Amino acid sequence: MKDDKGRSDTVNGYYISNSKLSSGFYKRNNANTASNDEKPNLEQNDIPSVTSSGSSTPSSISIEKEIKISKGNVIVKAIRSWSLYVAIIAILLLLVILHSFQGRPQDNGCGKSYVWPSYVRFVDFDERYTRFANKYSLYLYREKSVEESDEPSGIPILFIPGNAGSYKQVRAFAAQAAHVYANAYAEDADGTLNAGKLVPDFFVVDFNEDFSAFHGQTLLDQAEYVNDAIPYILSLYRQNRKISSEYDNEAFPPPTSVILLGHSMGGIVAQATFTMKNYVDGSVNTLITLATPHAMAPLPFDRHLVEFYESIKNFWSQSFLLSPEENSLDDVLLVSIAGGGLDTHVVPEYSSISTFVPPSNGLMVFTSGIPSVWAEIDHQAMAWCENFRRVLIRGIFAIMDARTSKCTVSLNLRKELLSRAYIQGSSFQNDITQISKPIAQYKALDLDLTYVYSEMPGQLLFLNQLGVSYIRHHIFPIPKPTSSIDRFELLTDQPIDLSSSNIKVLACRLDPKIDNTISALLENGNNKVINANCHLLRELVTLLPASTAYTSSPYGGDSFYNYVLPKEKMDDYHFILVSDDSKAPASGFVVGGFSNVSLDPKTIKGSQIELFKSGRKFQFDTKGSISKRFRFPGIQSSIMAYTISVTYELYPGAVPQKEFTPMLKQSIESPFETKYHVNMSNTELSVHGISPFMEFFGKESEKSLTLEFFLNPAIYKSVYVSIQPSYYRSAGRLLMRYRTLLASFPVVVISLAAYNQFRYFHYGSAYLSMSAALEVMIRKGLIKLLFLVSILSIAFSYLISRVELIVADGADPVASWKIFAMMVPKSFWKQNHLLFGLQTAQFWFLAPLLTLMFVGLVITASVIILCVMHLLAFIYGIYLRYKGLTFTGVCQAVKFSFQCLRTRNTRKLDHGEFKKLSSFLSQRNMYYANPSLCYVYGKKHMQARIIGIMLLLLMAMTVVPFQLVYGVALCTQTVTTAKALHLARFCTKSSHYRKKLWDFYNFSCTITILMLLLAPLDFPVLIVWARNLSMHWSIPFPTHHNFFSIIPFILLTEILRTGKMLPRLNDVEYYINNVFLFLLSFYSLIYGAEKPYLIHNVVGLYFFWLLFLYAKNGFFVQNISKWPIIPRMKYFIKHKFLRSIS
């Protein structure tokens, strides 16, 4: 058929020419034919019997022979279908997970911080220093309430914001640092300067809120910019230090390194600076990261982001395996601070650094265990939490030392001071740099006011009120030898680490000129005074949250002080002195004494099955110690939550204290996590230990839960503990750890559904709809799939090489780490990134449970997509009506077209009857009466499409990322599918032709759903690109101009746009097609969590196969041969080129 412009048309399997319209219009293409009578569904009368176009002739499959199909209307079919109930189960599971996730403890123990900010931009930091000068900026923060000069002259600290983070997030930390220095300088200016403390100069980079979590190249650009900024920052001090009049310039050399403070992905940028080519050796020696996902990328959808992570971890781990002379990181300290369970952006376990940093150069803590914080903090609050910033800046201020060019103390001292600040704690009045130095005091104790306790453990000091008893001095003689005791321990609510405290706990030596034992002094009745040299050992004091009858959470209240003197340090002393110097009655308590109970935790054994079934129950006596520790080898997974109930048996006549109620401390060693539960009776337990998809590194005992109970042994006689699994609370913990599978696992389900579509289509049936294919998959393959994932989960959990070595107690931790680090890379199974990442076989049941949920969610999503397609088809029908259709014209077109079909004669189209319909309006009526004619495209239109494709591909290879072209292809395919649905629903031609339209729609819908599932993997890069475009940043994405990543999608969508149905396959093609579908399903199932970005390539490979099938049946030859340029090229080659050569 030629239109008024001379275009020759193709109608979905029928070829129209100007000369042989009749024969061409009804030329049969067996590859596209199905002799059905009705719209394809699962009814008996819809099962056709059509032979395949291949060499073999398989018999038609009867669906009812394999699956019992219900009769009735749509509602009855839906009620009786298995898909509905699987979808309902999946939705219920998802709702339980979401409700559990939202119902987790939400208490945020953060106070708001108040600042007076001022930012100084360095406009001189331009293209002379960095190629990113037009994109990023560098600022210096100044707190106007205490700082007047805008010139940096102190100690440089560079803050790096995270994903979509603002440079203004530095204000809370910088303001606190400015106040800390101002207060210290005002209190003792000379002492502050002599200690090497100068004003902290907080610099900050402005990344214009880049989406660094989505794109590896963006992280590389940011790391390069940071390395460009560091030398510029250091250059500012060479002149400013010389002209400063606040201190002796000779005592403070110009700095050669900066301290990096990174929030979220800013911590990864800080860590990556060492791997860049423009890094200056020694320019950074301390990194502190806040809520940074060091172990894994939070969204591994970008190939270069995952490779970026791997390169960083490999660089760090391999560097520490070198000798100190060759290791560029030998003097670098990395401190990682995680926010805990309130962080909904980053999985807390991802902040672990133990796999690539040895204990000598790394420190990892959770905010729930940081003294004076004792709270989980959400991701954004890490940048402004008042309680947290006080402790954080206190640690940074402690390690600063401007007397050296590195501006920090030595590596060992840095870790010791930060451990003191972030793990052990101390009163804020103390200078933590001086805590390790004992405070000497000489004591002359009046024996009339002194009580001497027995040398044997068991006798307890218990003061329920201070300043009341006439006994003011309590002496605990240290037995010689000390083998009969393990330690001296004391707990109080008084700040015993201050020399001004009313309660003093001192380790004392007797005056050797008088006597050297307490017993000798007491036997001598003439002595009225005990003279002793005593020391306040502040490093033995650890801060604990206050646990009273009035506290409900560990944060926001006062502190307890726990004093523990191990027997190894008792040899230099004769007795422990506890003095009550209160001059008037005061509230407070003291409980303490010798303990012969080891601090080593007692192991509570039991099988994992028993733990899941009935939990753990045990009891213990409190006699002999304030604290008791227990370890639970089976409780180590981060996806399981528990509830703990504690009941107490009191001594007869004892009354519970209000000032000190029982407290529970839960902890694991790797990663180091501590959490406190005050006023303990019932609470929830969960750990951030072994996590899905995380490397198993170190000893298993380091990841087991340890519980430590603090209580008054003078009141409580026995404790009864019951730990029960909480499956409801555990459900909420699955969301954060398996959210990436929401993007990859649906591909598994759709691939298996496509297999069923091709299977029935190959054996003569209609091409099943997605709903029917999913129903078949559920009835015939769901049990097999659940069984498969269960077996694979168990097998993978046992195949993982955990590199667990028997390391002697007390062995050098650095040497042990190197052994682990050297053995882990040698194992292929070193990481459990496969399938669901389950590292213990006991959790195998999660695999089929999650699989069932994902299958049901795919069913739900497919129903939603089909509804959207029907809506788009309806809109398309309205569009056709508004293109000038009339009821009379439609009726004439219907009548005319049926005459042609009935007589099998189209000569009328060449004569007067067609002339009557040749107007634009009449042609539209004809299209609406025969919707298949809407697939007709002329030569010029096809040429325009080809030119458009070539332009898109050229742009994808040069200017825009291929993900943008993919979005265009997805939109085109969506419109094609909606159009196909409209044509199939309103086609007025024969039932056989209408069947072809339904087959084409179902096939196109499958392709559309598959492409839609890839969108979450590709669109994050588009967000980054659009962000750069909005900032007028024109540097292209060199890593996202991949021709082969987009060409199969473009070509296939263009083929489908012409309405060409995939031909039936012969047996060989059918089995090859199955291999491709199973490959796609297998890869998405096994590697979907580790490398989901490669799913795009696997789908592209499958689309190449579909293109081959189209090409094999002559689609490209038939269409390309019609281009006018083809005969011209033949004429040119034959008559011009060949003649010129001859």
Curated annotation (Swiss-Prot):
The chain crosses the membrane at residues 81-101, 741-761, 781-801, 849-869, 946-966, 1006-1026, 1035-1055, 1075-1095, 1097-1117. The active site is at residue 264. One of its GO terms (biological process) is GPI anchor biosynthetic process. Its EC number is 3.1.-.-. GO terms for cellular component: endoplasmic reticulum; endoplasmic reticulum membrane; Golgi apparatus. Keywords: Endoplasmic reticulum, Glycoprotein, Hydrolase, Membrane, Protein transport, Transmembrane, Transmembrane helix, Transport. GO terms for molecular function: phosphatidylinositol deacylase activity. The keyword Transport applies. Glycans are attached at residues 596, 679, 1002, 1028, 1119. It is a multi-pass membrane protein. PROSITE patterns: LIPASE_SER. SUPFAM superfamilies: alpha/beta-Hydrolases. Its main location: endoplasmic reticulum. Residues 24-59 are annotated as: Disordered. It is found in: Endoplasmic reticulum membrane. Belongs to the GPI inositol-deacylase family. This is GPI inositol-deacylase. It comes from Schizosaccharomyces pombe (strain 972 / ATCC 24843) (Fission yeast).
